Amino acid sequence: QPQPDQANHTVDFVLTVNPGRKYYVNQIHISGNNKTRDAVIRREMRQTEAAPYDSAKLNRSKDRIQLLGYFDDVKVETRPLPDTPDQVDVDVSVKERSTGSVEVAAGWVQDTGLVLSAGVAQDNLFGTGKSANFRIARGKTQNTASLSFTDPYFTPDGVSLGYDIYYRGFMPYKSSSSSSSNNYETTRIGLGARMGVPITEYDRINFGLGVEHLTVKLHGDETYQPYRYRQFIQEHGEKNWIVKGN
């Protein structure tokens, strides 16, 4: 409302602001998660119960739930409470998808023959949000196996922890076309741990540490053994422990 001042030839303006009603979230209801536990979804919510309603936090909550990869569809809706005009309930409805896979394969490789492989993976283990996968492959000259497990919420604030175990055996001396450069074998058995620490809502730092046991063996006449492997054994021996970090 303008208030003119004739003496000083000025005009004052008075702005009157009437703040709107502030809404609070009463309860958050989750439905459609027949397998996934409620806690897995609730920990992604940035909008919390008994807190002021924030549309930005609600949208971010929906994005985080979708990024889990466990659901084909995610809907987040608000519902006013008839008896309490300053409160709303939040309804989160999800449509679950398959989060597991099984793979079986067979192939033929020249010189090594038949190669068989199989694997099983689950990204939402028992509905806990943890993931695990196992892979195995077997051939004439190479055998591998690996097992991985990840807990994305090892701590309540989102620090993740994962483990990896693997075996890799490489035996080119068994090849049907074994030559002077193939008379050796290597075996690697490793164990590692991974950790991820969130530093912002969108960024995190990942690092890991592992240990590997390496065995190198030579076969046949020394004349047909790779020089670099003979040199490695002379300097370090057949068996070694290796520490890895990233």
Q: Which role does the model predict for each range below?
A:
Residues 51-246:
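Gram-negative/organellar outer-membrane beta-barrel architecture
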